[in-house]
């Protein structure tokens, strides 16, 4: 096989063979390969909207929301399966809670949503023929995934499904690693869920697998699973957590850019938990969230920010406050984020940067006063303005720096002020130019 020219089918096979990594390690330990020109073009077509979107909403919601003590409560508190199952009798959210999620996402400037259709606890939020342990056959009495899909579409948002391969509830969920008959039963159960999700809800934009413990790609029959997904949803994009490389990588709770043109998305919480945790008050500030979004956009990635609704589907007030603040900033400054390009300039004591074409956006987190300076910018500046108001900003450029002058002593915008800098070409920064070229006094 010529690994430099692989069809999608051969590519999936190779990834299945080479991607046996520990469940706790979400990286992909596979040899670098290149797709055929046709497969590259197909991936670019499918991912175009995603690269432009930059910002999405993650929703972790399930039976653990009833307990309100973290989404891993079943495992971390050693709850027996029969005891945990009783939570399904208390999980009866208010109708169409997802409408509030979607409206909040749109106000926050997010362009897509990803909801947990089944988390590690094994409870299915969708109607399935495989088990009675699902929302339509328990207290909720309805398909919660269907409500979510309809809500997202009503707000013009792209639809993503999270699905956990690991399952603490299914009898074969652990023994499948040692018992071939159990593996076959369990894999058929999982593949049936994926088929139902890809068949019953119209066009789906993202499939977001999670935790592939305890099997490898061969055990999960991941190649077969992905081929089914693409057959049923030819425009979908999939992540890398079923032990195949997929279309994009998923650094968790950190911002870590991929090398080359590999797509990536940082998923992060607003506090310390993915699911609703009533006692977790360690909330990130809107400023921190905005800085994270800027950092992701700067390095060519996406930012998937999580909320953990309560059992009734309502959103914690602090999440609403944070996302509303982020949305107010995005209303004025979203141009610097959406459809932005990887940005080489990155060094400043008080700012970070994004880029769109030849326009450099300096996001000033710590306002220095009436003058903002950027050292080592090697591209000639044509003009500058405050992005939120369009107000012209005066500047002076010499070989060492660009100084933007005549600004107010107090930051014009809260929590981050953005200066749009139009350059003659793609903006480039030499990080050691000043150190190397600045004239020094003779001793």
Per-region residue spans from a language model:
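N-terminal secretory signal peptides
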Residues: 1-10
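Cleavable N-terminal signal peptides
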Residues: 27-28
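Mature catalytic domains of secreted/periplasmic carbohydrate-active enzymes
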Residues: 12-22, 31-443
């Amino acid at each position: 096989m010529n690994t430099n020219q692989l069809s999608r089918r051969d590519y999936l096979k190779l990834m299945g063979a080479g991607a046996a990594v520990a469940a706790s390690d979400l990286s992909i330990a596979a040899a670098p390969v290149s797709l055929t020109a046709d497969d590259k073009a197909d991936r670019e077509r499918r991912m175009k909207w995603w690269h432009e979107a930059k910002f999405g909403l993650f929703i972790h919601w399930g039976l653990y929301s009833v307990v309100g003590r973290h989404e891993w409560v079943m495992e971390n508190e050693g709850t027996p399966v029969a005891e945990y199952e009783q939570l399904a009798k208390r999980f009866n959210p208010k109708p169409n809670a997802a409408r509030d999620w979607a409206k909040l996402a749109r106000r926050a400037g997010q362009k897509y949503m990803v909801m947990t259709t089944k988390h590690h606890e094994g409870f299915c939020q969708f109607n399935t023929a495989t088990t009675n342990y699902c929302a339509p056959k328990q207290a909720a009495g309805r398909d919660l995934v269907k409500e979510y899909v309809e809500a997202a579409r009503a707000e013009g948002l792209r639809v993503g499904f999270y699905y956990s391969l690991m399952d603490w509830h299914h009898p074969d969920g652990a023994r499948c690693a040692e018992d071939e008959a159990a593996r076959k039963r369990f894999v058929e159960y999982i593949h049936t869920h994926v088929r139902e999700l890809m068949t019953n809800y119209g066009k789906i934009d993202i499939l977001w697998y999670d935790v592939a413990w305890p099997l490898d790609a061969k055990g999960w029959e991941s190649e077969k699973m992905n081929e089914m997904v693409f057959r049923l949803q030819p425009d979908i994009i999939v992540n890398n957590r079923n032990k195949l490389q997929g279309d994009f990588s998923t650094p968790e709770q950190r911002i870590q850019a991929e090398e080359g043109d590999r797509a990536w998305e940082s998923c992060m919480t607003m506090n310390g938990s993915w699911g609703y945790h009533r006692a977790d008050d360690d909330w990130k500030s809107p400023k921190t969230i905005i800085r994270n979004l800027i950092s992701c956009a700067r390095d060519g990635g996406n930012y998937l920010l999580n909320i953990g609704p309560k059992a009734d589907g309502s959103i914690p007030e602090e999440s609403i406050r944070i996302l509303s603040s982020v949305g107010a900033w995005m209303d004025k400054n979203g141009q610097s984020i959406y459809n932005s390009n990887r940005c080489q300039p990155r060094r400043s004591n008080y700012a970070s940067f994004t880029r769109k074409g030849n326009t450099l956006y300096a996001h000033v987190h710590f306002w220095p006063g009436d003058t903002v300076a950027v050292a080592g910018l090697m591209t000639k500046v044509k003009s500058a303005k405050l992005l939120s108001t369009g107000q012209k900003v005066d500047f002076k450029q010499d070989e060492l720096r660009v100084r933007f002058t005549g600004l107010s002593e107090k930051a014009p915008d809260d929590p981050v002020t953005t200066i749009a800098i139009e350059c003659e070409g793609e903006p480039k920064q030499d990080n050691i130019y000043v150190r190397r070229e600045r004239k020094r006094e003779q001793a």
